[in-house]
Amino acid sequence: EKNPELGVEIRLLQVRAQIMFPPIVSRPTFFLRKKPRQIFSLEDYKAQGALSEKYYGIILDCIKKRKNIIVAGATGSGKTTFLNAILKKLSEINPEHRLVILEDLPELQCSSDDVQYMTTSGNRTTSVTMQDLVFISMRLSPQRILIGEVRDKSAYDVLKAWNTGHPGGFCTIHADGCH
C-alpha cells in the first residue's frame, strides 16, 4: 500500500511496464508497451496520406530554421511515433548537431552522430526530475534539447531553455488540440 505502482523499463526486451496494485486500482494490473521496431519517416506519413505536402514542407522548414516543434495529442494518438519521424528527418538534415534527449522512460530513437540520452529517476526517495534534467542539459552545450513528454512544472524550464540559446527543440504534450 505504501508504493502501489511501479513503472519500469526492460531494456533487453525493449518493453516498458506499468504495474499497479490496490488501492489505486481495484485489482492488480500489469500493462506492457513495446518499442516499435520500425521508425516511420515523414515521407511514410505523406505516402499514407496522414501528412500533406504543405505540412511536410512546414516541418522541414522548422527543422532547418531551428524552430521549436511541439507535438500535441491525446494518449495513444501517436505523438511519440510522429516525433520519432521528425527526429529521423533531423538526423538526415543535421547529423552533426549535438542533441540532448530528455525522457521519463526511453521511447525516442535517434540515429544522429552526437546524441546524449538522459532519463529521470522515478525513485520516490531520491529523484532526478525533468526540471533537473533540463537544467543539467543546458551545461552540456547542446545544439538542440529534445524532450519525450513535457508536463507539469518542467514546461516552464523547457521553454526557458529553448529561448536561451538552445532553439530547435522538440517535445510532446498531452492535449486535445493545438488551441
How would you describe each model-predicted region?
Residues 1-65:
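P-loop NTP-binding catalytic core
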Residues 66-72, 81, 85-179:
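Switch/coupling sub-region of P-loop NTPases
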Residues 75:
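Anionic-ligand-binding alpha/beta catalytic cores of soluble enzymes and soluble regulatory domains
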Residues 78:
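Conserved glycine(s) of the Walker
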